[in-house]
Amino acid sequence: VSDFSLLGGIRGSFDNGLNYDFSGRTGESEIRYTLGNTINPSQGRASQQSFKPGDLINSETQFQADFNYEFETAFGTPVLLAFGTSYMDESYEVVQGELNSYTAGPHATQDPFGLCNADKTAPTAAGTSVIAGGSTLDCANSSDPVYQVVGVGSNGFPGFSPQFSEKYERSSFAVFA
């Protein structure tokens, strides 16, 4: 996590009694994610064990001008008139993670090695071979492990894909009295 901010301002009064307060601020916060000692289960044994799933960046800049003026009324009670304006520019960015942190590997589909036939009723030659080696493969049983799909993306925190990586910005302006 890295953060920085800067702010400043000045207050005072004009000769006519109008008080002012001018200020500005800017800042940014960035989170750079890193994962270690984990895998992308859908990539199986070929999975790397550390990932950079992406970053989050938030930044804001604001300028403000506030004024107030106190004047006497005919009722003998002073009235304070306050008014001002504010402008703010802000952005939020989701930075894409590295490819293997969000992509699906071969284990993200049912029967990734083609052990069962297309209609899921009988083993293929490859399936017959693993059965001969001691496997309990049962292609007719939909709960057989060959049909179980594992998670996609780095385990614990899948990375940000291009589909969800973008910079969002907006500006706002306000006046008050």
Task: Tell me the role of every PLM-derived stretch.
Residues V1-A177:
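Face-selective signature of the C-terminal outer-membrane beta-barrel domain
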